Amino acid sequence: MLRRRSKRRYLSIIHAGESIASLNAITKRFCELFGTIAAEKAAIRLVRQGTNESIIKCRLDELEKVLVAITLIDPPVVTIAMSGSIRQLRRRRQQYSDLKTRVI
């Protein structure tokens, strides 16, 4: 039987401060809520980092738990977009920034 690679989801987040600190806060809260084994299964990783925006990835099976951990961390982090590929995530992020400039 073939072993399939697990599916991933990419999340674009806005945070205050360093992106490494935000990722560590997400991982720490995830461990507190669901345990270290679940945190390893979630495979939360930093893909790209910017000044206030970052892209993180996690496994699809653990996505809901990751979103709960993001919601419950302090300082708060906002999830802008979510996608299965980085290319589509960039498009959605661009749509978000276009919409934000139209509103302002």
Question: What kind of region is each of these model predictions?
Answer:
Residues R3-I20:
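Short glycine-/aliphatic-rich beta-strand segments at the starts of folded cytosolic domains
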Residues S19-E40:
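Short amphipathic alpha-helix segments
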Residues I26, V66-D74:
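Short amphipathic alpha-helices in soluble, non-transmembrane regions
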Residues K57-E64:
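Helix N-cap motif at beta-to-alpha junctions
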Residues Q88-I104:
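Short, low-order "capping/linker" segments at domain edges
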